[in-house]
Swiss-Prot record:
One of its GO terms (molecular function) is thioredoxin-dependent peroxiredoxin activity. One of its GO terms (cellular component) is cytosol. InterPro entries: AhpC/TSA, Peroxiredoxin, Peroxiredoxin_C, Thioredoxin-like_sf, Thioredoxin_domain. It catalyses: a hydroperoxide + [thioredoxin]-dithiol = an alcohol + [thioredoxin]-disulfide + H2O. Its EC number is 1.11.1.24. PANTHER family: THIOREDOXIN PEROXIDASE, THIOREDOXIN-DEPENDENT PEROXIDE REDUCTASE, MITOCHONDRIAL. It holds the Pfam family 1-cysPrx_C. It comes from Drosophila melanogaster. This is Thioredoxin-dependent peroxide reductase, mitochondrial. The gene is Prx3. The active site is a conserved redox-active cysteine residue, the peroxidatic cysteine (C(P)), which makes the nucleophilic attack on the peroxide substrate. The peroxide oxidizes the C(P)-SH to cysteine sulfenic acid (C(P)-SOH), which then reacts with another cysteine residue, the resolving cysteine (C(R)), to form a disulfide bridge. The disulfide is subsequently reduced by an appropriate electron donor to complete the catalytic cycle. In this typical 2-Cys peroxiredoxin, C(R) is provided by the other dimeric subunit to form an intersubunit disulfide. Residues 40-198 form the Thioredoxin domain. Residues 1-30 form a transit peptide. It is an enzyme of class 1 (oxidoreductase). Homodimer; disulfide-linked, upon oxidation. 6 homodimers assemble to form a ring-like dodecamer. Also exists as a monomer, however the monomeric form is present at a much lower level than the homodimeric form.
Length: 234
């Protein structure tokens, strides 16, 4: 057997290990490039984001950090110039004062460009546009934000109707995701924020269907104290 042949045989295991190591490195790089930042979980920090948004008919960079100290309703919708989407977007805009009254901002997101958002904001609502909105629309053209919040439909390349309530410390408190054909309830989003704020301020918990106006009874989270609630509502 020649010297070259013997050398090849001796080095086969080393060559195999080198190839395997290279493959692992490539796989790790691909995973890092394509995977979401982290799983979206209630009680954990909301995934960070930043991008260009339409704010008062101009382009501005918007990032999660901008909303520290306030509650944020971050809601995703599929596309501009569609059917259910303008009804939701306008509904949030028409109720914006109610959100501001409880220290809350609203931010809409889709995979459209900021140019598309701007054009849509300049189409009359009677013609399927959204008109001048009282909160920003953020562009997620790269689809990174939608992927990080786990609402992206990979095949269609659009986002589901995800709604995320983020508290003043950047912690995710609640989220829900609707399938494409059904719009969400602004009333329910407001109710949830008020419930979280009530718990923070008073230390009592909010039962099913709690409402600060029509059904304000709460529960003290104590075995004995909770009996006062259940004796009346059980």
């Amino acid at each position: 057997m020649s010297f070259v042949a013997r050398s090849l045989i001796r080095n086969v295991p080393l060559m195999g290990k080198a190839i395997l190591s290279q493959q692992k490195q490539i796989a790790a790089r691909l995973l890092h490039q394509t995977a979401p930042l982290a799983a979206v979980r209630v009680q954990q920090p909301a995934p960070d984001f930043k991008g260009l948004a339409v704010v008062d008919n101009s382009f501005q960079e918007v990032k999660l950090e901008d909303y520290r100290g306030k509650y944020l309703v971050l809601f995703f919708y599929p596309l501009d110039f569609t059917f259910v989407c303008p009804t939701e977007i306008v509904a949030f805009s028409e109720r914006i004062k109610e959100f501001h009254d409880i220290n809350t901002e609203v931010l809409g997101v889709s995979v459209d460009s900021h140019f598309s958002h701007l054009t849509w904001c300049n189409v009359d609502r009677k013609n399927g546009g959204v008109g001048q909105l009282k909160y920003p629309l953020l562009s997620d053209l790269t689809k990174k934000i939608s992927a990080d919040y786990d609402v992206l439909l990979d095949k269609e390349g659009i986002s589901l109707r995800g709604t995320f309530i983020i508290d003043p410390n950047g912690i995710l408190r609640q989220y829900s995701i609707n399938d494409l054909p059904v719009g969400r309830s602004v009333d329910e989003v407001l109710r949830l924020i008020k419930a979280f704020q009530f718990v923070e301020q008073h230390g009592e918990v909010c039962p099913a269907n709690w409402n600060p106006n029509s059904n304000p009874a709460t529960i003290k989270p104590d075995v004995e104290e909770s009996k006062k609630y259940f004796s009346k509502h059980g």
